[in-house]
A protein has these predicted regions:
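Hydrophobic alpha-helical segments at protein termini of multi-pass membrane proteins
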Residues: 1-226
């Protein structure tokens, strides 16, 4: 089997695994997988505009010659966190949020995770093909769970927003979920950017694992509640 095919399979498998894993946790069983896959595919295609926007912003901020700390913060929380979680938020809000069948917290979690995994799938393929299958193995236990955790928490609050009767509370939960996703995603990336950009902080990268474990535990607890 060609090495490229193997690399693609390594990149795609963890995203499909997590998609079916969280789908299996839906006690209502009303969200069939064929309803979820379109959102997964929207997430895949959304990586194109996100990549273009991130590249433009990155080129702009590099003109200011920020130090590694400021650059890492902007790259993590604005370029990666805000843009990527914003794209997933838009997909769910635009394509499923107003559907009358989208009416529970678990709906929010499942569909937002589906959008995030579609995005992570193409991102994984790109990194794995350009940097090798070893990167794909590493991302299966780091970047993919990161997308799941950040977007899953956002999805919890999107679902909670949909169950509200008051527009003010609905907007509160939508904003709350988005901010939490950006903070989780941004903190993860900030540690990686800083550890890669300054040898004195190289050990910081190990902190991504407590972040992933805590975030996934909290998300899994919420999933089991609903």
């Amino acid at each position: 089997m060609p090495i490229e095919i193997i690399s693609i399979l390594i990149a795609v498998f963890p995203t499909i695994y997590f998609l079916f894993f969280f789908h299996s946790k839906d006690k209502s069983k009303k969200n069939s997988i064929h309803k979820i896959f379109p959102i997964f595919f929207f997430g895949m295609f959304m990586i194109i505009p996100v990549f273009l926007i991130e590249t433009i912003i990155d080129n702009i901020i590099k003109e200011f010659y920020f130090n590694i700390y400021i650059y890492s913060f902007i790259a993590s929380f604005i370029i990666a966190g805000f843009c990527e979680e914003g794209a997933k938020f838009i997909i769910v809000k635009k394509f499923v949020y107003d559907n009358p069948h989208f009416n529970s917290i678990m709906d929010g979690i499942i569909y937002t995770i589906a959008a995030s995994l579609g995005f992570a799938c193409i991102e994984n393929v790109g990194y794995t093909l350009s940097m090798g299958s070893n990167v794909g193995y590493i991302r299966a236990f780091t970047a993919v769970p990161l997308h799941v955790c950040a977007s899953g928490m956002m999805g919890y609050y999107i679902g909670k927003a949909k169950t509200q009767n008051h527009p003010k509370m609905e907007n509160y939960y939508l904003k709350n979920g988005f901010i939490r996703a950006v903070m989780i995603h941004g903190t993860y990336d900030f540690l990686l950017f800083l550890s890669a950009g300054d040898p004195g902080y190289s050990d910081l990268s190990i902190l991504i694992f407590p972040i992933l474990i805590i975030s996934f535990t909290l998300l899994y607890k919420k999933v089991n509640e609903y």
